[in-house]
């Protein structure tokens, strides 16, 4: 199952390392990533495979929320199927 992780907040050292570290810890494979700094704001989108994630979807959201709070950033996890359903893909 594919999902998108988006990260937005003030640019600080270690953002990519911490988010990718959590992915590694939870057996989430990062398939693609893009990031940019926009006037001092960090923005990143990761396409990930969560099919072998070692925790439930609910616990994954909790862990992402906890990391976001620690870092003072916004982190969202959205399954690709949400977007596919909106455009009529199965």
Task: Show which residues each predicted segment covers.
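A conserved regulatory-domain signal marking ACT and ACT-like small-molecule sensing domains
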Residues: 1-90
């Amino acid at each position: 199952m594919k999902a998108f992780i988006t990260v937005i907040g003030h640019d600080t050292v270690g953002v990519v390392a911490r988010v990718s570290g959590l992915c590694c810890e939870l057996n989430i494979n990062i398939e693609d990533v893009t990031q940019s700094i926009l006037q001092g704001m960090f923005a990143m989108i990761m396409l990930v495979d969560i099919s072998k994630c070692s925790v439930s979807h609910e616990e994954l959201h909790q862990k992402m929320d906890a990391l976001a709070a620690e870092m003072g950033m916004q982190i969202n996890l959205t399954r690709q199927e949400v977007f596919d359903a909106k455009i009529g893909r199965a």
